[in-house]
Amino acid sequence: MGKGFFNVPIAVNEPVKSYAPGSPERDAVLKTYKALFNSQVEVPLYINGNHVTTGNTRTMSPPHDHKHVVGTYHLAKQSHVEEAIATALEARKTWSQLPWEHRAGIFLKAAELIAGPYRDKINAATMIAQSKNIHQAEIDAACELIDFLRFNVQFMTDIYAEQPESTTEAWNRIEYRPLEGFTYAVTPFNFTAIAGNLPACMALMGNVVIWKPSDSQVYSAKVIMDVFEEAGVPPGVINVVFGDPVMISNTVLASPDFSGLHFTGSTYVFKELWKQIGNNIHNYKTYPRIVGETGGKDFIVAHRSANAKQVATAISRGAFEFQGQKCSAASRAYIPSNLWEDVKRYVIEDVKSFKMGSPEDMSNFITAVIHEGSFDKLAKYIDGAKADSDAEIIVGGNYDKSKGYFIEPTVIVTSNPKYTTMCTELFGPVITIYVYDEHKYVETLKLVDETSEYALTGAILSADRYAIDEATKALQNSAGNFYINDKPTGAVVGQQPFGGARASGTNDKAGSAQNLLRWVSPRMIKETFVTPVDYRYPFLG
Ligand code: NAD
């Protein structure tokens, strides 16, 4: 910064619009939805600011209407990925030297573009691409992405302001340099906000990026790129390639200039990428930063003192919103025997009241799961539960992929606390419940801690403070985001930094300064004012 210590706007969370019947935002988003749904878009690669078409394309279809085509996207060859890397490294020469206030200005502008002129489009695109109902689209594609962009600017300046002590003899300064080389963002299908944030936060800190979105999110990724372009992200700073993830990752990770991976997705893929980075370690110019937020097997534990209606609501919302396709979605619950009959009745009532169908019909709470692979996997586990003697489906259990990938919200009750669906991440609208002896709370907490390899989110519901304290201690390492008397989903940027440990990731807390710190390499500068001219110290006489 040259000529001032600039204050950035104080970050505030974007208010969530209601989309209630009769509201102007409801009409506007539906109009945009219809226009997008009934037209076709062509999505190019983005390399050095150019829209690159390769002739090798794949079609895009909404999960709730999979025979309907809303466009095509172009697939990269290895040479495109290599070009994107070369381009990024060239762009780095100017981008990494640009004063921070200009980087801040670009991403603050992106936030306001989404809050205003692009809001309907990014929400409608997310409803189409990922089959989100309007509320789920609004809290993700609009609000969370806006929040990431605004708060990251504030976090960046907080980091820059973190400086060492100086003395009268020497002035100590830390410069938060971007990483040397280029970075790689690999993003999941389920959150448009995560897709935008992973490349944007690295670019904000002065890095250049190759971004590989999920095949199932390309349609809404295009809107993110439209916004970044209009906001003024210069050519070559964020380059986007679609296509074979293995080829793209092999090409990226083979480059000696690869300097950081920002990944969100499944645990297996992340571990494979980590392994590959390890295998290539002798080839890199620097030690690459590795940040990954991955799977979860998120829990709800109710204590015998809990309110049954509150427990049931935490299950209905926590497990089934966005068809359970949130990394934080509750997928196993432990209910004490004294509450079970009431919780069961309320949950069944709730689930039976859910309407399922296209997000265009705004009375639908449940829409489709993301793709056929996910549908088939969920159907297999549901069939398994129907056949297994230690499992019982108490509501749901049907599925139909004739028009869209629709899985009925399903509640499995098991007598075996280690039943397969108590341990495995299914990533769909299925929760498994284990009813425990109300007097075996301590043993149950131990069980919760030991049942899964993951440690992302979890919730305790209780009216008893001692029981809450007991759970907080016993489950200290079982969740990176722990909720007391709430559902385990719905983290808000700037309020609940998000991430888990164990197999759930590196826990670098998206939506916090901690995450941004991973994308800089500090340089310590000591400036001595009166430089010594004699090597002898006084003790030498
Ligand atoms: P996924 O692992 O299938 O895909 C994630 C990304 O990795 C995509 O871009 C995909 O194309 C890419 N990929 C897939 N195979 C690859 C390979 N062999 N090499 C390189 N890249 C590859 O995950 P998904 O289905 O998109 O998302 C769901 C998963 O993401 C769940 O496990 C969920 O828990 C997790 N998730 C975690 C968080 C979190 O914050 N912890 C947030 C969202 C999603």
Indicate residue ranges for each PLM-predicted region.
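Short linear capping/connector segments at secondary-structure termini
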Residues: 125-132, 164-168, 361-367
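Residue-level signal for inorganic ion chemistry
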Residues: 67, 88, 103, 206, ...
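Hydrophobic face of amphipathic alpha-helices that form TPR/SEL1-like repeat modules
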Residues: 1-69
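Rossmann-like NAD(P) dinucleotide-binding subdomain of oxidoreductase/dehydrogenase enzymes
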Residues: 127, 146, 156-310, 503, ...
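ALDH superfamily catalytic-core signature
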Residues: 227-232, 254-256, 260, 267-417, ...
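Conserved C-terminal structural/oligomerization subdomain of aldehyde/semialdehyde dehydrogenase
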Residues: 1-9, 14, 18, 64-72, ...
